[in-house]
Amino acid sequence: MSGMFYGTNIPNLDLSSFNTQNVTDMSRMFEDTEYTVKLYLNNFDTRNVQDFTEMFSLSRRYAIDSLTNIYVKNDFNISSVSKQIFNVFKGRRTLRGGNGSKCSFSGYNNEALKCLRIDRPGEAGYFTQI
């Protein structure tokens, strides 16, 4: 699924019916989705995903950033990640978790993977629970 929705600008992208149980690469899946405001990834099964590099990133410095919410049922399972992951949320300025949190991390290492979770008190994440 690498780059599958690259540059797509559907305001509300609902992928809750996608079967992702055998996917191993979600890198750049939503890169440069400048006008997408909400992503619905309710049933994403990420237990086999090894690469989340630039999954939600904006590659251009002055890109329009409209993404505010990513909706999920569960945290992403990152147990299969087997390499260094970069820039998962690079350039995202408007994205917030369900409790309003903004993750703080360098973005240049696996620290960004910690934000692939539901935003909870004491645990910042970029996801909003459905």
Language-model segment annotations:
Residues 2-130:
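Negatively charged
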